[in-house]
Amino acid sequence: MVMIYDQDGNVLVEDRLNPTWPGITFPGGHVEADEPLVDAAVREVWEETGLKVSQLELCGIKDWLEADGSRYLVLLYKTQTFSGQVKSSREGNIFWTKLADLKQLKFASGMETMLEVFLSPKYSEHYLDTTNGRHDNLLK
């Protein structure tokens, strides 16, 4: 997942169309077999937004345990180095908004906690604790 921002205080967001995880988030997606993680983030941003990004800075991770015991990791990057024209995709509607106004939008589940990892140097992990049938968002 990549937070793309500019020098004017804007961030690029995606209003996801997928009914299993709707709401405002940043672009991102899955890693293909034998694909470096940064390359996957760059590719997903291109596919979902039409922008070419570079100089990604790793902010932290989001992680949780799946029901089968496997661990799922999402790497959280940010960059202000991009080129191209913004376009929406089948994943969602893409648009710029002021970072100061971001929390007024309807976030996808967990996005508000992930945003803390993107913005605060005191956090590097958003752990989704799924023990005891609950979904607790923890910052580390």
Where are these regions (language model features)?
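Unchanged
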Residues: 31-54, 64-114, 139
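Charged phosphate-binding loop/patch that engages nucleotide di/tri-phosphates or the phosphate backbone
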Residues: 117-140
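A short, polar/proline- and glycine-enriched secondary-structure boundary/capping micro-motif
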Residues: 22-26, 98-99
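Flexible, glycine-rich phosphate/dinucleotide-binding loops
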Residues: 11, 20, 65-67
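Conserved N-terminal beta-strand and adjoining loop/helix that marks the start
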Residues: 1-11, 27
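A conserved beta-turn-beta hairpin within the catalytic core of GNAT-like acetyltransferases
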Residues: 19-22, 73
